Design a protein with these regions (language model features):
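N-terminal basic, amphipathic alpha-helical segments
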Residues: 1-103, 114, 299-300, 305, ...
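Active-site PLP attachment segment
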Residues: 44, 268-303
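Residue-level detector of conserved, well-ordered beta-strand and adjacent loop positions
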Residues: 50, 84, 194, 267, ...
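Short, solvent-exposed loop/turn segments at secondary-structure junctions
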Residues: 54, 86-90, 153, 175-177, ...
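Amphipathic, well-packed alpha-helical segments that form the structural scaffold of globular domains
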Residues: 99, 103-107, 130-134, 214, ...
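Conserved core of the PLP fold type I
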Residues: 112-243, 254-255, 261-269, 276, ...
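Hydrophobic residues in beta-strands of the RecA-like P-loop NTPase core, especially within AAA+ ATPase
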Residues: 171, 248-249
C-alpha cells in the first residue's frame, strides 16, 4: 500500500502485534526507515511519513555485456591504540586466505599474469565488482562502465582529465582532505559548501558556479552524516538542471554500518546518468590493497575512451586476480562480517 506524507504510523508494539512478529523486528524496520529519511520520529507523538518527491524506479535492463575490449609513507610507530582515520585492525587480516589465493594465482608458472592487462582493469574483476555493487549497494551499471585504479586519488586525477581542469568542484565543508588536495593541486576552482544535519546545503550549492559536487551520502567524512532520501533527491535535481553537471558519490566506509542495513547508494536512484560512483577496498580489507574503482555514467565513458583510454592499468594483474577470487569464493563477505563484529 501507499502512505501519504504526514501519515502517522502505528507504534512498534502495535505493528508487531498486527504482523505477529517480535517488537525488536519492527523497531529495526523503523530505525532503517529513519536512517534513510523515509519517516521521522516526533517526541511524545510517534512516527510519521516524511514529505518526499515521488520516487523514480530505476530498473536494470540487462544490457548485453560487450566483449573484452600519492600517499605519504607510513612510519612504523609502536602505538598501543591507533586513532588515525585510516586505522585498520590488521591483526584480523585474512592471511591464510590471501596466501592460498596468491599461490593459486601463480601456480603452474602462469605467465599471463605478467602480461599487459586491460587498461580499465581485468574484465573478470569488473564483473565481480558489478555483481557485488548491485547486490550490496543497489548500484546499476555494466562492467564496461567500471574503471579499476590504484586508489581514489588516482581515479580522481583521471576523472579530472575527463571533465577539464577549469570545471568548478563543490565540496562538503568539512570534507575528505585527500579529495580537496587532489582537486586543488590540479587547478580546479573549489567551492566549499556548508552542511546542516542532513548534509550539503543544496540552496547554497545552487549559488556556486560548480558543475561537479563531491559528496559522501552514506557516511560523510569526517562528520558521519547519512544524507536522507529527500536531500539526495535535491542533489540529483541540481545535477539534472544543466548539461555537464555531475555528482561524485564517494561511498567511503559504507560497508561498516552497525545498526540496520547499509544505506543504498545514491547512484541507484539516478535515472539520468548523473552520478559518478567511487569506492575502494583499501578501507574494507587493508590500506596496502590499493585497489579502487569508479563507475562512470555512459556519457563520460565515451569521453574516457577518447581522452584517457590509452593509460595503462595501475593495478597489477596478479593483485586483481587475487582480489577477484577473494570476492568470488566468499572470503570478502566473511571478512566484512568479521570486521563489523570487531569494530563494533
Amino acid at each position: 500500500g501507499r502512505l501519504r506524507a504526514g501519515s502517522r504510523l502505528p507504534s512498534t508494539r502495535i505493528l508487531a502485534g498486527n504482523l505477529h512478529v517480535s517488537r525488536s523486528t519492527t523497531q529495526l524496520a523503523y530505525e532503517q526507515l529513519l536512517s534513510e529519511g523515509y519517516i521521522e520520529a516526533l517526541p511524545c507523538r510517534g512516527y510519521f511519513v516524511c514529505q518526499i518527491e515521488e520516487l523514480v524506479e530505476v530498473k536494470y535492463h540487462g544490457v548485453p555485456e560487450e566483449k573484452e575490449e600519492k600517499q605519504e609513507e607510513n612510519e612504523n610507530y609502536n602505538y598501543k591504540v591507533d586513532f588515525s582515520p585510516r586505522g585498520i585492525d590488521l591483526d584480523s587480516f585474512p592471511f591464510n586466505a590471501w596466501r592460498k589465493l596468491s599461490k593459486n594465482t601463480l601456480v603452474d608458472d602462469n605467465k599471463d599474469m605478467f602480461a599487459v592487462g586491460n587498461a580499465q582493469g581485468e574484465y573478470s574483476l569488473r564483473q565481480v565488482i558489478r555483481d557485488y555493487l548491485h547486490s550490496a549497494r543497489g548500484v546499476h551499471c555494466r562492467p564496461e562502465q567500471i574503471l579499476v585504479g590504484a586508489g581514489s586519488e588516482y581515479l580522481l586525477m583521471l576523472l579530472s582529465q575527463l571533465i577539464g581542469r577549469s570545471t568548478g568542484i563543490a565540496l562538503e565543508n568539512p570534507t575528505y582532505k585527500q579529495a580537496f588536495r587532489v582537486f586543488e593541486s590540479l587547478g580546479h576552482p573549489i567551492f566549499p559548501v556548508s552542511m546542516d544535519e542532513w548534509g550539503m546545503k543544496v540552496k547554497e550549492l545552487e549559488k556556486t558556479q560548480a558543475r561537479i559536487a563531491y559528496v559522501m551520502p552514506s557516511h560523510q567524512y569526517p562528520t558521519g552524516i547519512v544524507i536522507p532520501i529527500k536531500r539526495r533527491q535535491e542533489l540529483l535535481k541540481w545535477a539534472k538542471k544543466q548539461e555537464g553537471r555531475y555528482l561524485i558519490e564517494d561511498d567511503y566506509d559504507s560497508e561498516f554500518r552497525y545498526k540496520g542495513r547499509p544505506i543504498p547508494a545514491l547512484q541507484g536512484m539516478d535515472d539520468s546518468q548523473k552520478v559518478i560512483y567511487m569506492g575502494t577496498f583499501s578501507r574494507s580489507i587493508a590500506p596496502a590493497i590499493r585497489v579502487g574503482f569508479m563507475v562512470l555514467p555512459e556519457p563520460l565513458l565515451a569521453l574516457y575512451r577518447e581522452k584517457a583510454g590509452f593509460y595503462a592499468s595501475t593495478v597489477s594483474r596478479v593483485d586483481q586476480n587475487i582480489l577477484t577470487h577473494f570476492i568470488i569464493e566468499g572470503y570478502y563477505e566473511r571478512h566484512l562480517n568479521r570486521m563489523r563484529s570487531v569494530y563494533r
